[in-house]
Structure formats: structure tokens, C-alpha cells
Curated annotation (Swiss-Prot):
The lineage of its organism: Bacteria, Pseudomonadati, Pseudomonadota, Gammaproteobacteria, Pseudomonadales. The active site is at R146, K170, H237, R240, H263, Y272. This is Tyrosine recombinase XerC. PANTHER family: PHAGE INTEGRASE-RELATED (PTHR30349), TYROSINE RECOMBINASE XERC (PTHR30349:SF81). Belongs to the 'phage' integrase family. XerC subfamily. GO terms for cellular component: cytoplasm. Disulfide bonds: none annotated. Site-specific tyrosine recombinase, which acts by catalyzing the cutting and rejoining of the recombining DNA molecules. The XerC-XerD complex is essential to convert dimers of the bacterial chromosome into monomers to permit their segregation at cell division. It also contributes to the segregational stability of plasmids. Residues 106-285 form the Tyr recombinase domain. It is found in: Cytoplasm. Forms a cyclic heterotetrameric complex composed of two molecules of XerC and two molecules of XerD. The gene is xerC. Keywords: Cell cycle, Cell division, Chromosome partition, Cytoplasm, DNA integration, DNA recombination, DNA-binding. One of its GO terms (biological process) is DNA transposition.
Length: 299
């Protein structure tokens, strides 16, 4: 069974050309299913049926797995069994018709515009790391990049003269995004410093040794910046969420935000409308003369 899983992961990497992050997530999810099969003494993937999978997902949910994580796991199982069926190794899909337990969808965490300005306008020390980190944060917020898109960015994808960046998103789909003036300035300051490291490839963001920055390194640097400037835990995706929320709040153009974020389904983008409504409700409660306030007596 394990060799079939290895072959599928190789297929995803070489034929489907999925990103390393996606491949790691698929392998992690399918390895959990494999461990369950081994514990249940199933001798082949053909032995796993919908009852087994329903029991497995219920147990995972009881152990704290979110509905979103379980939905991703079931999607991985469906993709795997599609491959097994095509290769003649199986004749069914145990995940067919199976849905994850429903759970409350958590709203993404964002910074408001004042906190974002506090983070980005906090002053940059004149050194390599500070200028690099500033360029990273400005670009994440300016263009709404995913972490994987940022760390995979190469020099030929940047056009600072016209203020554009081309990124390779999920499903190997490319999109061209605007780069704001603040991000352009930060990048123009950073790129000459980058050249001094004698970079080993065309990565836009490199370490002091000239090596491409990985996701974990970026996460740690942004976490440090958040603690220093805001006194809070900050992660790269929070800047992407803030980009989406602030843009939607200003433009009210859901389709445009969907395109900029690279969402295949507009339902994924619609979660930001809930954030916008929360903001409007807060403004209403604080500003409307007849708004119902906590502690106010009923008329």
C-alpha cells in the first residue's frame, strides 16, 4: 500500500507539477489514512470502504481536526483513488458521497489600516535584514501574495518600471498583479543589497548567504516584526487577508478581489464580506445616534 502512495506522490510532483507545499499536505493526509488502514489490518487500498473512511473522519474530528482540514483530506483521498482506478489498482472510491462534519468557519485574522500602517511605517534600520524584511512585508500587503508565491518569486517576474509582478499560484496558474508605490520603493532599496550576496539563483528574496528564503524563514522574520512593532503574533497570510479586507472595504468589488487573490471559487473570497460587515457594524454601533449599545436600557 505504501508503494502505491509513493508512486502517487511522484505522479503529483512530476506529472501534475503540484507545489512542494501542496505535495507535503497530500502526503501527510494520505499517510494518516494509510496508518488507519494498517491498524485496521486492511491489506490493500481496495479494502478501504466508505464505512471505514466515515469512522476515520469521525475519530479525527473528535481529536480536534477542523472540518476544513477533513475536507482537504477527503479531497486528497478522492484524487488518490482516481489515480488508483486509472492505473487499474482499484475499482471504487470510498470517499464518493462522503462529506466532512460541518463546523463553524473561522474568519481570517486581519490588521486594521492603522495597525498595518504602524507595522509598515515603523521605521527601517539601515541594514540588510531590515530592508529585505520591509520589502517582503510591503509586497505581501501591496499585492496580496500567498507565502508560497512570495518565496517562489524570481527576478524575471518583477517589472518595477510598470509596477507589476507575475506570480505562479495554485494549480500552476499565473496572474499579474499591481505593485504599489511603497512596495516598489522598498524593492528598489532591497535589490542592490540582494546583489551583494552573490545569489545562487534568481530568487528575489535571499538570505545573507545568497540562498533562496524558505517559507519558515519568512514566517519567523514576520513574527519578529509583529512582536517588535505591534506586540502581537503576526504571520504572512495575515497581510494577505488584510490586503483583501481593506481592498474590498474600499472598492466593494468582490470579483476584482477574487481575481487579485487568485481564488478559483468566489465563495472563498466571500468570507471577506463577513469581515467588512463586522467593520460596518462596529461603525454603526459607535456612530449611529439610535444604535443599541451594550448596557443601554430598553425603551
Amino acid at each position: 500500500m505504501e508503494q502505491h502512495l509513493d508512486a502517487y506522490c511522484m505522479h503529483l510532483r512530476s506529472e501534475r507539477q503540484v507545489s512542494p507545499h501542496t505535495l507535503e499536505a497530500y502526503r501527510r493526509d494520505l499517510s494518516k489514512v494509510l496508518a488507519y488502514c494498517q491498524k485496521a489490518r486492511l491489506s490493500s487500498w481496495n479494502d478501504l470502504d466508505i464505512q471505514h473512511l466515515r469512522s476515520f473522519t469521525a475519530r479525527q474530528h473528535q481529536q480536534g481536526q477542523s472540518s476544513r482540514s477533513l475536507a482537504r483530506m477527503l479531497s486528497a483521498v478522492r484524487g488518490f483513488y482516481k489515480y488508483l482506478n486509472r492505473e487499474g489498482l482499484c475499482q471504487h472510491d470510498p470517499a464518493n458521497g462522503l462529506s466532512p462534519p460541518k463546523g463553524e468557519r473561522r474568519l481570517p485574522k486581519t490588521l486594521d489600516t492603522d495597525r498595518t500602517a504602524q507595522l509598515l511605517d515603523g521605521g527601517v534600520e539601515d541594514d540588510f535584514l531590515a530592508h529585505r524584511d520591509q520589502a517582503i512585508m510591503e509586497l505581501l500587503y501591496s499585492s496580496g501574495l500567498r507565502l508560497s508565491e512570495l518565496t517562489g518569486l524570481n527576478l524575471d517576474q518583477l517589472d518595477l518600471r510598470d509596477g507589476l509582478v507575475q506570480v505562479l499560484g495554485k494549480g500552476s496558474k499565473t496572474r499579474v498583479l499591481p505593485v504599489g508605490s511603497k512596495a516598489r520603493q522598498a524593492l528598489e532599496t532591497w535589490l542592490p543589497l540582494r546583489a551583494l550576496t552573490n545569489p545562487q539563483d534568481d530568487a528575489v528574496f535571499v538570505s545573507q548567504q545568497g540562498k533562496r528564503l524558505g517559507p519558515r524563514a519568512v514566517q519567523l522574520r514576520i513574527k519578529t516584526a509583529g512582536e517588535r512593532e505591534l506586540g502581537q503574533n503576526l504571520h504572512p497570510h495575515m497581510l494577505r487577508h488584510s490586503f483583501a479586507s481593506h481592498l474590498l472595504e474600499s472598492s466593494q468589488d468582490l470579483r476584482a478581489v477574487q481575481e487579485l487573490l487568485g481564488h478559483a471559487d468566489i465563495k472563498t473570497t466571500q468570507i471577506y464580506t463577513h469581515l467588512d460587515f463586522q467593520h460596518l457594524a462596529t461603525v454603526y454601533d459607535s456612530a449611529h445616534p439610535r444604535a443599541k449599545r451594550k448596557g443601554a436600557a430598553d425603551d
